[in-house]
């Protein structure tokens, strides 16, 4: 619908809410405003309409409309542009509240809560309506503003007290009006005006801002023309408000949606009509039509309810009315302004005493007991809304009596805590309407609306119901349609669950994952059986089967609603043989549910559990049965770490056994430590010092009273001496005896035992003691042979030897490994069987001669004899052979009286169908989970039970293998670097939650090089092998581990290989497997090479998190566009000198930006073009000859995790990109696989020459800037601004991604100092900088770039706009810059042309900086200004701060908490309104930086909105705000803090007033002692005013006590390094450094880290600790304690002391006033001579600095020219050198060995030459990229 300029409000008369919304959506903003203005004009005409008390002004309407228009989501708002009226006892800001009493009138400072909610929903308030004075009456005639007549008759009353609201809705002026209802005022007017009157459940609408009538009973009510509008407003207004309304309460979470079809409705047995004859007819007809809905209508005696009703006016509740206006009445208001009837009623309260009050309350409670009994079997009450349609004259004749009769059926409702809905009953024969009221129990509001709808369909058939006065029109069917409570069947699917998905059971999390809503618990129809299916995994599954009624039962189930869009995700988690079908409920309704395939309930082991009536009862029976089992052990110690320790603890918890973990120093924070009930430190680092130290383990068991020790696998699990030691100590070893371990654990003796058992053996030797003997035996066996450590395991201590030349080295290596890892150097040899498969049998023995095989596993896929992927059952294995294998294992176990778990390993020759004994592992195997998955057994539980001599009966145990299970081992190793160990800190970890994942790692886990590299075992179960392969592939695709390199890509390549699909496996197949990684490798890192994305990390500038991203975004975007990537795809930024990169996969690349020699395999390649790269090619990007940065785009991007929404690297914060750092030598970057690559957008394309950035060849640049935020004449003199643009600025050598420093003319300041902001004229109170701001740090400008700080205290003269920032990214030290002024419009034009040109690759669309764009002169940065209104509404200055920012500055240059609060109010308003175009609000001390999206809102449009918002912000000095009190430990002047100061003195500035000690400086300039500085720090409470003061959530905080605000100064120049956690004082401000960063505050101590990078702490939802208005306190701790706390913080276990609180400004002002004398004295002491001395001190220091700055550079070691630096490619422990300083070596010759994760890695010489330095000694830790040696190359 559209409207012309001459349209009047008449067209909108009678519109519903939806009509209004449809109009606004289909009309222009101008048309919408015109119609609203027309409506307002139509009410401002003579004669005066008594329904209104006040109407808004045109200005107010425009203001409301402007704010509505600014909202981004306005068209989705439920009341978008809908005009509403409000009863004049409800506060509306901008209109007086009178309560119909002129002398009572006041101007509210804010909206009532309900009005606020309606405005938030898009409503426009048009006026306040008339009422019975002080809402006392049901007639609508008790008002000095006139009597409001019925909408149908001027002679009849409208009903009260909400008369005006009913009138304006009935006449269609507005579709909705608010009333209030204490005793019927929201219902009686509805009946008399043909309306819907909704009186909600008491307390669900806030009464904040409502003039009370009876506060304990008051309800805000809704008048509407239709049910839909009433429900819509109910949903909006139904919000708890406990902070502002004492009677507020939340709505129930699952309210009744509808009454049953045979709902029981009670009507009064006796109805007094007081002589009325027409209304009984209407009521009787209404009741009859209710019956036709199927309702069961009964008559009851309403006397208890009527007795309750009489209490309202005959009891002490009238005293509430008196209390509400007592102070007003005491002020002796003019009598003529008071309604005599109302006042006489209210003053009747004076006769009651406090005793009477309690007496009547007791009486009410007694009556309520009768009412509860009366309503026990009743769902709904139906009563006449009011018995009469009184005339004005009748009311005048009997004002109290008529009023009293009208409340007959309304007065009791709120006293009884009931909900009510008044609805029309039709018209009398005299044309007047009346109605009925449906009354339900509390929280039945939705059901009452639905019942009313049913009633309407009967009483007004075929859509014949009229509304209000519109008797010739009918309500549209859509306008009586209801949504109901939040569960919406149109967007959800009802699902019945019957098994492990029930509440509290193991799979309930799956329902939570898909956001399912619980609806009810019910039963099936009598046609079902329930089965418990065979358990083939950790979770017991049910099978629901439909049968004939005579054979079936009712089964209990729970019903949920699942969002349709997530239903597929839920189905994907349903395991076979279950599926989704339908089930019939006892109500007859059919809904979705689980069904079971016939194979499920017919499978062996299926149990019919129908008799239990439901799965939960059966589950509880099993739990009870389980708990009655024999008690095994009270406490068990796990002598292990990692995933196996975690897995064992799960079983111990299930069995109710107390678990004890032991841990090394590196494992202090590991999961097994936190999961266990008790944890004991072993105090050591290496395995030998900890997990292999038998004495420590046994001591820990004794210390914790552990009765048993379970060793897992590895470490001491197969150590016979340990088993014996446990036995000697009286501790049960969960495993076989020492003798058995000794016999089987040593592989040579195990062969002898197997031989006795008749098991076929591979030809081999006994133990060999020398290399010579090894050579002899190997020759006899014939090569190839296997060299094996007799004590080895897990792939460690066995290697293949192909020829005699290798035997010596490998023999010594295996011997060393056996001794190092297993404490046994014994070695023997076996013949190597070509193409053998490794098949093993899981064995359990009871220790008394019985043994049982639990199936076999194929573990043939091995690399370096380390298993990679295992599966069960073994594929391609004849059943006869399978049984023979199992039988051989059982025989061996029985022969030995084997106890607990063991694995008998065989070599299987598939070609010959023969197997040979390999060895017995006398422990639990790594791959045991796949056996558990197919058998449903818990092998750890079996071990525990067997160890406790409570073994299962093997004779009766039937082990059935169901389906296929596979396991892939995820290792921290680099498959591109020969699987070298890859330790590191895991920054992101995601595993599929539908698969079984046995792991010990999570985000934040530190992978140590000390131990096995296993991260996780990913286990799946399928119905067959193909299904298992598919699931394992899916699980691997969903697995994401970042922070260290893993073998995940390698595993995926194997799983998807042809040989694996066909099960063509052998133990050596991976030796020849051609793994083709999807990765690139850094072989030379370049000067500063990092991963970035565009637009970077948006939305966290206010926190101090810079966006990072590319310095030259234009070139970066071109690179992605050329290769066909989405613009957000991560790519590589190169600075000055580029990297060399080996591509291990085929792809397409593009290099853009600065010019450099780029070669591919030595051949030069072009820039700015797509280039195809072959697998194995090497890309080299040389030194940039023009520009500073180049960009490498790779098709599909790079697989790195997002951090705070971006892939970009922020090196100072150590976040984003690749491990939060620049790329180093040896880094391997994986590229997304085809399955997960969503970055590719189009095909690669060439770009036109005209799009290539024009990088200066002359080193001279012209860069456009916008003026401001700070300019002339308030900060700079005009000539200084002119000079800024006329002079050329040289780029300083100290320029980088944090900022580009400039050298040029000294600014001419317009002021002598920065006032409160600081001593220098460049200083100001901390505010948030714009990206690209030219920031004057003193007299030296620096351009804030993408990694720069956000919050600071220096003025900014100009800002480089977004389109020109690319140039800043390309300037080099020594280049010169000429700045030119641009307007906002020109800046936006440049930006938009860039965007269009890049997207279209059309060079003609690109606009470059030219003379047309440049302003003739600089402009004022002040865009607008609002003058001061009062102290709480100060002057506001809107400053231009670039082309995407506006800086809003409040008041004078002083810190003021009221200003801070005003800023907070503005931020909250923008957030609430979701204001169009605003990206982020960043708070400073007295300003807020607003970032906006120029595509959504222009600068001018934004200014209009911001100005409008200012008038919305109203508060007084008594404001309160949520504030956390954060108490932090601080070590005063700890060594690390003092080291920062010393480093500064040694490297930056040797002398300054604050040197050598910062605390002494603070004490001296303030004339106090060091102790007083100390006392201040630990007694002050600091208020946080902003974040990012340096970086990453660092607070800018001020002491609340003015006496703690000392004189002071920041460092000049700043420090280049500040320790993380350092606490600084800068004048009146305090800062905590969140990262190792530059800084300038005076350092006083150190606290814990305040940036939780990975959100590891349980309380961390975001990385930053503080928010504005939080309060910080410090308490003293020692440095030693602080270091411990810091370590705990870094591992997420430290709990910060945070107290939830409220900062009460009124209370604070009282405290200030109570201490004003001492505060004044302190402040005066800082002025005068002291201030002058301080200023002079700083001035002299700055002068000295200019004259001479002593900078001592860091010492650098001098190596000969051409020396070759050798870097480590991995992290580990330096084991030993294999060459010495002075040795002459050849290229490729080994230099040294690094030991990491049980592997020895040789670092070889890259070139020939003489070793001149080895940088490490034995035992040193070495990080990847560290220098390890230096070689002097020889000619």
Swiss-Prot record:
Protein keywords: ATP-binding, Biotin, Hydrolase, Ligase, Multifunctional enzyme, Nucleotide-binding, Phosphoprotein
Protein's pathway: Nitrogen metabolism; urea degradation; CO(2) and NH(3) from urea (allophanate route): step 1/2; Nitrogen metabolism; urea degradation; CO(2) and NH(3) from urea (allophanate route): step 2/2
Superkingdom as given in the UniProt entry: Eukaryota
Pfam families: AH_C, Amidase, Biotin_carb_C, Biotin_carb_N, Biotin_lipoyl, CPSase_L_D2, CT_A_B, CT_C_D
Protein name as catalogued: Urea amidolyase
Cofactor: biotin
NCBIfam families on file: allophanate_hyd, PRK08186.1, urea_amlyse_rel, urea_carbox
EC numbers for this chain: 6.3.4.6, 3.5.1.54
Disulfide links within the chain: none
Residues modified to N6-biotinyllysine: 1798
Source organism: Saccharomyces cerevisiae (strain ATCC 204508 / S288c) (Baker's yeast)
GO molecular-function term, one example from the UniProt record: ATP binding
Induction details: By allophanate or its non-metabolized analog oxalurate. Repressed in the presence of readily used nitrogen sources.
Domain named Biotinyl-binding: residues: 1754-1832
Gene Ontology biological-process annotations: allantoin catabolic process; urea catabolic process
Note in the entry: Present with 952 molecules/cell in log phase SD medium.
Its job: Hydrolysis of urea to ammonia and CO(2).
Domain ATP-grasp: 751-948
Keyword presence, Cell membrane: no
Reactions performed catalytically: urea + hydrogencarbonate + ATP = urea-1-carboxylate + ADP + phosphate + H(+); urea-1-carboxylate + H2O + 3 H(+) = 2 NH4(+) + 2 CO2
Sites where the protein binds ATP: 122-129, 747, 830, 865
Domain Biotin carboxylation as annotated: residue spans: 632-1075
GO CC entries: cytoplasm
PTM annotation (Phosphoserine): residues: 803
Subunit structure: Monomer.
């Amino acid at each position: 619908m559209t409207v012309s300029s001459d349209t009047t409000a008449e067209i909108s008369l009678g519109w519903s809410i939806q009509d209004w919304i449809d109009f606004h959506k289909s009309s222009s903003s101008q048309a919408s405003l015109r119609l609203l203005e027309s409506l307002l004009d139509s009410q401002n005409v003579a004669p005066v309409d008594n329904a209104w008390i006040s109407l808004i002004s045109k200005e107010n309407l425009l203001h409301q409309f402007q704010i509505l228009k600014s909202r981004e989501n306005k068209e989705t708002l439920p009341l978008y542009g809908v005009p509403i009226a409000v009863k004049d006892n409800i506060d509306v800001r901008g209109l007086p509240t009178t309560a119909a009493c002129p002398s009572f009138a006041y101007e509210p400072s804010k909206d009532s809560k309900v009005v606020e909610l309606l405005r938030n929903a898009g409503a426009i308030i048009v006026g306040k309506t008339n009422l019975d004075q002080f809402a006392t009456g049901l007639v609508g005639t008790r008002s000095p503003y006139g009597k409001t007549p019925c909408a149908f008759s001027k002679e009849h009353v409208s009903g009260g007290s909400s008369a005006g609201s009913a009138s304006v809705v009935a006449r269609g002026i507005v579709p909705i009006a608010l009333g209030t209802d204490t005793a019927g005022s929201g219902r009686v007017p509805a009946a008399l005006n043909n309306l819907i009157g909704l009186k909600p459940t008491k307390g669900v609408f806030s009464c904040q801002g409502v003039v009370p009538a009876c506060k304990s009973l008051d309800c805000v009510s809704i008048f509407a023309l239709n049910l839909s509008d009433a429900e819509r407003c109910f949903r909006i207004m139904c919000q708890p408000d406990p902070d502002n309304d004492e009677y507020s309460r939340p709505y129930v979470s699952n309210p009744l949606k509808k009454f049953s079809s045979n709902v029981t409705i009670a009507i009064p047995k006796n109805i007094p009509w007081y002589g009325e004859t027409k209304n009984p007819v209407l009521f009787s007809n209404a009741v009859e039509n209710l019956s036709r809905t199927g309702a069961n209508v009964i008559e009851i005696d309403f006397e208890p309810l009527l007795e309750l009703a009489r209490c309202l006016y005959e009891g002490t509740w009238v005293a509430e009315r008196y209390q509400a206006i007592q102070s007003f009445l005491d002020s002796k208001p003019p009598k003529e302004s008071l309604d005599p009837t109302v006042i006489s009623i209210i003053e009747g309260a004076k006769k009651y005493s406090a005793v009477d009050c309690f007496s009547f309350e007791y009486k009410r409670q007694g009556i309520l007991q009768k009412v509860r009994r009366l309503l026990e079997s009743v769902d709904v009450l139906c009563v006449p809304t009011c018995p009469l349609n009184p005339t004005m004259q009748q009311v005048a004749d009997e004002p109290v009596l008529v009023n009293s009769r009208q409340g007959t059926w309304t007065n009791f409702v709120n006293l009884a805590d009931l909900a009510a809905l008044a609805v029309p009953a039709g018209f009398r024969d005299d044309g007047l309407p009346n109605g009925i009221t449906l009354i339900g129990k509390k929280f039945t509001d939705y059901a009452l609306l639905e019942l009313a709808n049913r009633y309407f369909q009967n009483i007004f058939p075929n859509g014949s119901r009229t509304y209000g006065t519109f008797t010739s029109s009918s309500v549209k069917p859509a306008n009586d349609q209801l949504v109901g409570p939040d569960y919406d069947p149109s967007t959800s699917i009802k699902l019945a669950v019957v098994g492990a998905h029930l509440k509290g059971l193991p799979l309930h999390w799956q329902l939570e994952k898909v956001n399912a809503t619980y609806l009810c618990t019910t039963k099936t129809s009598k046609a079902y059986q329930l089965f418990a299916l065979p358990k083939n995994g950790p979770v017991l599954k049910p099978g629901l089967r439909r049968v004939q009624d005579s054979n079936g039962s009712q089964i209990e189930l729970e019903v949920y609603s699942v969002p349709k869009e997530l239903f597929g995700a839920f189905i994907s988690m349903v395991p076979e043989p279950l599926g989704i079908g339908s089930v019939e409920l006892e109500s007859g309704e059919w809904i979705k549910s689980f069904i079971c395939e016939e194979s499920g309930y017919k499978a062996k082991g299926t149990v019919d559990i129908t008799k239990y009536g439901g799965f939960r009862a059966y589950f509880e029976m099993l739990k009870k049965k389980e708990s009655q089992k024999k008690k095994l052990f009270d406490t068990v110690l796990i002598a292990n770490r990692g995933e196996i320790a975690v897995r064992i603890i799960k079983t111990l918890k299930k069995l109710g056994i107390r678990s004890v973990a032991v841990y090394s120093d590196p494992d202090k924070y590991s999961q097994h430590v936190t999961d266990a009930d008790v944890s004991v430190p072993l105090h050591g680092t290496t395995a030998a010092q900890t997990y292999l130290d038998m004495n420590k383990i046994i001591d820990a068991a004794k210390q914790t009273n552990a009765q048993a020790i379970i060793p897992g696998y590895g470490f001491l699990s197969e150590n016979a001496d340990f088993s014996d030691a446990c036995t000697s100590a009286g501790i049960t070893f969960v495993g076989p005896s020492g003798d058995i371990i000794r016999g089987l654990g040593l592989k040579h003796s195990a062969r002898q035992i197997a031989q006795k058992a008749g098991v076929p053996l591979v030809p081999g030797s006994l133990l060999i003691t020398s290399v010579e003997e090894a050579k002899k035996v190997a020759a006899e066996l014939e090569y190839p042979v296997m060299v094996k450590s007799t004590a080895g395991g897990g792939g460690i201590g066995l290697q293949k030897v192909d020829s005699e030349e290798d035997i010596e080295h490998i023999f010594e290596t295996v011997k060393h490994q056996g001794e190092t890892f297993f404490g046994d150097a014994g070695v023997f040899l076996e013949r190597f069987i070509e193409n053998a498969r490794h098949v093993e049998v899981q064995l359990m023995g009871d220790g008394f001669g019985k043994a049982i095989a639990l199936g076999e596993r194929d573990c043939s896929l091995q690399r370096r004899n380390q298993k990679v992927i295992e599966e069960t059952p073994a594929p391609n294995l004849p059943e006869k052979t399978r049984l023979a294998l199992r039988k051989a294992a059982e025989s061996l176990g029985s022969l030995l009286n084997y106890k607990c778990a063991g694995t008998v390993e065989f070599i299987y020759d598939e070609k010959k169908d023969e197997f040979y004994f390999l060895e017995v592992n006398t422990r639990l195997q790594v791959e045991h989970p796949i056996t558990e998955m197919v058998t449903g057994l818990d092998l750890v539980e079996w071990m525990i039970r067997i160890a406790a001599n409570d073994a299962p009966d093997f004779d009766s145990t039937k082990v059935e293998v169901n389906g296929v299970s596979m396991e892939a081992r995820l290792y921290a190793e680099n498959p591109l670097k020969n699987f070298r160990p890859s330790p590191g800190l895991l920054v992101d970890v995601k595993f599929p939650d539908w698969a079984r994942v046995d792991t010990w790692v999570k985000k934040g886990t530190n992978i140590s090089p000390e131990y096995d590299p296993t991260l996780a075992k990913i286990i799946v179960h399928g119905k067959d092998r193909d299904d298992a392969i598919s699931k394992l592939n899916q699980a691997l695709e969903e697995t994401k581990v970042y922070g260290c390199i893993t073998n995940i890509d390698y595993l995926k390549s194997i799983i998807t290989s042809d040989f694996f699909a066909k099960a063509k496996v052998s133990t050596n197949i991976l030796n020849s497997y051609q793994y083709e990684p999807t990765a690139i490798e850094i072989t030379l890192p370049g000067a500063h090479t990092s991963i970035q994305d565009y637009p970077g990390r948006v939305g966290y500038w206010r926190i101090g998190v810079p966006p990072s991203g590319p310095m030259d975004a234009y070139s970066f975007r071109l690179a992605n566009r050329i290769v066909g990537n989405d613009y957000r795809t991560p790519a590589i930024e190169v600075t000055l000198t580029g990297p060399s990169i080996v591509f291990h996969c085929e792809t397409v690349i593009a290099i853009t930006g600065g010019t450099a020699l780029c070669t591919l395999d030595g051949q030069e390649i072009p820039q700015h073009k797509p280039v195809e790269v072959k697998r194995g090619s090497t890309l080299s990007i040389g030194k940039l000859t023009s520009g500073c940065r180049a960009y490498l785009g790779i098709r599909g991007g790079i697989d790195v995790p997002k951090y705070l929404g971006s892939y970009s690297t922020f090196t100072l914060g150590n976040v984003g990109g690749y491990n939060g750092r620049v790329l180093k030598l040896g880094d391997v970057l994986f590229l997304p696989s085809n399955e997960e690559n969503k970055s590719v957008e189009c095909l690669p394309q060439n770009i036109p020459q005209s799009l290539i950035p024009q990088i200066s060849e002359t080193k001279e640049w012209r860069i456009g800037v916008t003026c401001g935020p700070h300019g002339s004449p308030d900060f700079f003199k005009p000539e200084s601004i002119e000079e800024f643009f006329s002079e050329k600025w040289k780029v300083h050598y100290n320029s980088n991604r944090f900022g580009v420093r400039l050298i040029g003319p000294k600014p001419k300041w317009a002021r002598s100092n920065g006032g409160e902001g600081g001593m220098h004229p460049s200083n100001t109170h901390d505010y948030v900088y714009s990206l690209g701001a030219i920031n004057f740090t003193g007299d030296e400008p620096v351009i804030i770039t993408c990694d720069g700080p956000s919050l600071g205290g220096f003025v900014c003269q100009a800002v480089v706009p977004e389109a020109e920032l690319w140039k800043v990214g390309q300037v080099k030290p020594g280049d010169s810059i000429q700045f030119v002024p641009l307007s906002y419009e020109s800046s936006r034009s440049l930006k938009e042309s860039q965007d269009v040109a890049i997207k279209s690759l059309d060079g003609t669309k690109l606009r470059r900086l030219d003379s047309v764009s440049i302003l003739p002169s600089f402009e004022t940065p002040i865009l607008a200004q609002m003058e001061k209104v009062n102290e709480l509404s100060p002057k506001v200055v809107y400053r231009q701060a670039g082309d995407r920012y506006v800086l809003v500055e409040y008041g004078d240059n002083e810190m003021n908490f009221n200003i801070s609060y005003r800023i907070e109010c503005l931020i909250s308003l923008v957030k609430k309104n979701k204001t169009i175009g605003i990206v982020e609000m960043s708070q400073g001390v007295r300003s807020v930086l607003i970032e906006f999206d120029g595509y959504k809102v222009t600068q001018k449009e934004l200014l209009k909105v911001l100005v409008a918002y200012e008038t919305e912000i109203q508060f007084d000095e008594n404001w309160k705000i949520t504030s956390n009190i954060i108490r932090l430990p601080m070590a005063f002047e700890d060594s690390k803090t003092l080291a920062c100061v010393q480093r500064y003195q040694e490297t930056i500035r040797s002398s300054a007033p604050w040197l050598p000690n910062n605390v002494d400086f603070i004490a001296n300039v303030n004339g106090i002692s060091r102790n007083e500085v100390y006392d201040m720090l630990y007694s002050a409470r600091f208020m946080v005013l902003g974040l990012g003061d340096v970086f990453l959530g660092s607070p800018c905080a001020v002491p609340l006590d003015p006496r703690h605000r000392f004189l002071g100064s920041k460092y000049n120049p700043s420090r280049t390094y500040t320790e993380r956690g350092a606490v600084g004082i800068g004048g009146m401000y305090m800062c905590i450094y969140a990262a190792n960063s530059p800084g300038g505050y005076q350092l006083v101590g150190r606290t814990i880290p305040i940036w939780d990078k990975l959100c590891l702490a349980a309380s961390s939802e975001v990385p930053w600790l503080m928010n504005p208005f939080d309060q910080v306190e410090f308490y003293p701790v020692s440095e030693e304690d602080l270091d411990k706390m810091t370590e705990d913080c870094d591992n997420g276990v430290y709990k910060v002391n945070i107290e939830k609180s409220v900062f009460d400004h009124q209370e604070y002002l009282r405290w200030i006033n109570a201490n004003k004398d001492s505060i004044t004295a302190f402040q005066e002491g800082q002025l005068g001579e002291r201030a002058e001395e301080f200023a002079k001190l700083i001035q002299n220091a700055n002068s000295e600095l200019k004259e001479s700055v002593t900078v001592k550079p860091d010492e650098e070691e001098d190596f000969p020219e051409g020396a070759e630096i050798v870097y480590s490619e991995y992290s580990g422990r330096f084991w030993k050198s294999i060459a010495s300083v002075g040795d002459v070596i050849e290229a490729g010759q080994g230099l040294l060995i690094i030991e990491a994760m049980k592997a020895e890695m040789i670092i070889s010489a890259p070139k020939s030459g003489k070793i001149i330095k080895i940088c490490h000694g034995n035992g040193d830790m070495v990080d990847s990229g560290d220098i390890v040696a230096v070689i002097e190359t020889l000619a």
